[in-house]
Amino acid sequence: MSLTLLPAVDVRDGKAVRLRQGESGSETDYGSPLDAARTWVDAGAQWIHLVDLDAAFGTGDNRAQLREIVRQLGDKVNIEMSGGVRDDASLDAALDAGAARVNIGTAALENPEWTARVIDKYGDKVAVGLDVRGHTLAARGWVKEGGGLFETMRFLDDAGCSRYVVTDVTRDGMMSGPNIDLLREVAERTDARVTASGGISKLDDLRAIKELLPLGVDSAILGKSLYAGAFTLEEALAVANA
């Protein structure tokens, strides 16, 4: 069994950036988002995790730019879109742009009825991002708290959610290793698939996540580790597919 890897391209003010712990103002600029995405596709990526940080933080959006990335690369790679998807208009815009999957942030959990409806309507084209601090959800660009993790999961499981993207926000962009215990806790409580996000800093972290494959942790998002040169995507894919 192989682990699916999703290199991340986070977009703010039209540029590819990386944040530390999801904090606005902590970004490092990595240039053109299209060039970044193309780099990962050329290196063998089958998925890209494309994030509109301005939409997530409520400071505008990069919708046109994200649409252009999908237009140019969508025939070569599956694109998961994330950031600021919290109503029909933002969800429809992402799907109409050609996203293979759309990640609904915990901000959408402020409207659970809507979340349940779109899960029912779109099935596995919708994933729910669980951004976690301890066992509490962080919402709206990680600034606010959004409720208990496991209570929220019970509701989403009942609604038929097919995938969770689980991020320990204290580790994201910190190169401090993923929270394996959290990933295991989530995977053991649901039949949904789980994507690991945040903190991956070395190839051994991917090996540790791979051990959770039998529980349903089938994929991992790679961000700062790739941009900072901790390892190459080719090296990561070799581990993921071993």
From Swiss-Prot:
Keyword Isomerase among record annotations: yes
Q: Name one GO molecular function term.
A: phosphoribosylanthranilate isomerase activity
Protein biosynthesis recorded as keyword: no
Which pathway, per its entry?
Answer: Amino-acid biosynthesis; L-histidine biosynthesis; L-histidine from 5-phospho-alpha-D-ribose 1-diphosphate: step 4/9
Cellular component GO terms held in the UniProt record = cytoplasm
What keywords tag this UniProt record?
A: Amino-acid biosynthesis, Cytoplasm, Histidine biosynthesis, Isomerase
Instruction: Read off the InterPro entries from this record.
Output: Aldolase_TIM, His_biosynth, HisA/PriA_Actinobacteria, Isoase_HisA-like, Isoase_HisA-like_bact, RibuloseP-bd_barrel
Q: What class of enzyme is it?
A: isomerase
Q: What is its EC number?
A: 5.3.1.16
Give the domain of life: Bacteria
Which residues does the entry assign to the active site, renumbered to this chain? D10, D131
Q: Where in or outside the cell is it found?
A: Cytoplasm
Q: Which residues form a coiled coil?
A: none
List the Pfam families: His_biosynth
Catalysed reaction per UniProt?
1-(5-phospho-beta-D-ribosyl)-5-[(5-phospho-beta-D-ribosylamino)methylideneamino]imidazole-4-carboxamide = 5-[(5-phospho-1-deoxy-D-ribulos-1-ylimino)methylamino]-1-(5-phospho-beta-D-ribosyl)imidazole-4-carboxamide
Q: What is its main location?
A: cytoplasm
**Per the UniProt entry, what is one GO biological process?**
L-tryptophan biosynthetic process
Q: Which NCBIfam families match?
A: hisA-trpF (TIGR01919)
**Alphabetized PANTHER family for the sequence:** 1-(5-PHOSPHORIBOSYL)-5-[(5-PHOSPHORIBOSYLAMINO)METHYLIDENEAMINO] IMIDAZOLE-4-CARBOXAMIDE ISOMERASE
Q: Which family does it belong to?
A: Belongs to the HisA/HisF family.
Name listed for the protein in its UniProt record: 1-(5-phosphoribosyl)-5-[(5-phosphoribosylamino)methylideneamino] imidazole-4-carboxamide isomerase
Give the organism, scientific name.
Bifidobacterium animalis subsp. lactis (strain AD011)
Q: Which gene encodes it?
A: hisA
